[in-house]
């Protein structure tokens, strides 16, 4: 019996496994709640989230647990050697999505596999983390860090661009956010870091100037201030030119990027800055989500008793806005407990990154930490109205087999690293 239990339990840090199990149980409890029958006259005009959603997720949980066990037991060298083949296979799958993937709500994000639908972009995150850890880990000594950084940027951009064309803006941003986390841990040059941060600021200011204020002067003023700072710093002409050129390119690129966004994506971003413009349209999700979380208070309305959820005011309550259900029914204490579990998982990943001896393993652990950090922070920020709605799930919690399986792969990699943390 003990031997059988050992085979059905993943190797590695038991604390990570317990955190994973608690998060999955949390998910199933919330999904059971959102699949309860709706009540009220308004709800009769809405569609229930069927109980099959819960039972499908149970099946995915079983498959994900098996995946967790397998990945935690694989040789670390094998994972490193397979990073390129896995990455290339995922790129092929992403290309297939655009060619033969079924179109749902104007986008192609899935591949039909019998009765199931898989979302290759979710597995692309795992593949990219593996490959970036391999690429950067083999370039920690000798050679140019700038060259290694630019090469890693290309490896992250390829799947990000393919996903953006589906279109799926939220998921494409995950690739870049994880890349930033890993490249920061790797040791990005100060020049590249300043260039990236200032260019990001330039893009945001240009968007706000053009789309919200409809005045060009804030962005022009920003460029003048930047040029003054560069002059006072007395840096090299090449470095100053790189920073200024990147800022101008980022700002001028915003109108081009905006033109390629889908109309619903544009509406969501505009509604974020001005919710009163369309309270019952594009801003509806964010408004109802904030109402749900706010009505929960400290202790919540109690499990299965959420009114925003039960009356169907809260859309996408089983997927992107499941955190709102936790906030409404379980209150600040319940939602806070959920966030603490994620925090413990991320902190453990960072601990592993500092304990392991191989650069590949350290970068891989940081990739896992970056993945969960970005997903959780952005999803919670969306549900609380701090960011525009982008359709990013809460890992291990939201309904969806592909995301659950991909997130379980990430946890499996972390467990594997905890086993081999003292290997050379």
For the regions a language model picked out, list residue spans one by one.
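Interfacial segments of multi-pass membrane proteins
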Residues: 173, 178-192, 308-330, 393-394, ...
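TM-adjacent membrane-interface loops and short helices in multi-pass inner/ER membrane proteins
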Residues: 271-319, 330-334
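Gly/Ser/Thr-rich beta-alpha loop segments that engage phosphate groups in nucleotides
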Residues: 29, 103, 108, 172, ...
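Cytosolic juxtamembrane amphipathic/interface segments immediately preceding
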Residues: 1-9, 47
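Hydrophobic alpha-helical transmembrane segments of multi-pass inner membrane proteins, especially
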Residues: 17-25, 29-32, 39-281, 327-384, ...
